[in-house]
Amino acid sequence: MTDPLAFRVMNEIGIIDQLGSTLFERSMPRGLTLPQFVVLNHFTRVGGDRSPVELANAIQVTKATMTSTLQRLERKGFVTSAPDATDGRSKRITITASGRKARDQSIKAIAHHLAALETAIGKKQLEAVLPVLAALRIFLDRQRDGD
């Protein structure tokens, strides 16, 4: 019996995620972990500030895990935290210029792998798959949020 098409697609994406994460972790600048990069990349992609809970939900980790990651990033000067103006119990986290630089350096560190991928698969094929992947992400985001 053949597995359902959607399962096979998700299975491939999961394997790609594991392989890509391993490759990325091996190439990251010293002292930066993949979870820390993910937070920096999230800020770069969406902009603005976020609460630790908002970040934990967006990245699909526990609040405790996010708090630990944010503390490490703050010690490195990659994010800042300030009291929430509307809710004094919460904090608002913002990426710093150093955080953006660390994120950009991480991408530069894997540039040769990205170039090899583009050569092996082809720019046109990668461009063709990108809208499908974006649609999958949007669908899964809505499922996560209960829409």
Q: Predicted regions: what is each one?
A:
Residues 1, 123-147:
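C-terminal regulatory/oligomerization modules of transcriptional regulators
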Residues 1-30, 76:
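N-terminal leader segment of winged-helix/HTH proteins
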Residues 5, 35-36, 51, 98, ...:
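N-terminal positioning helix adjacent to the helix-turn-helix/winged-helix DNA-binding module
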Residues 10-17, 96, 130-137:
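Generic structural concept
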Residues 14, 41-47, 107, 134:
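Short, locally clustered residues in the helix-turn-helix/winged-helix DNA-binding domain
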Residues 22-65:
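N-terminal helix-turn-helix DNA-binding core of bacterial DNA-binding proteins
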Residues 68:
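DNA-binding alpha-helical recognition surfaces that contact promoter or target DNA
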Residues 71-131:
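Charged, amphipathic alpha-helical coiled-coil/dimerization segments
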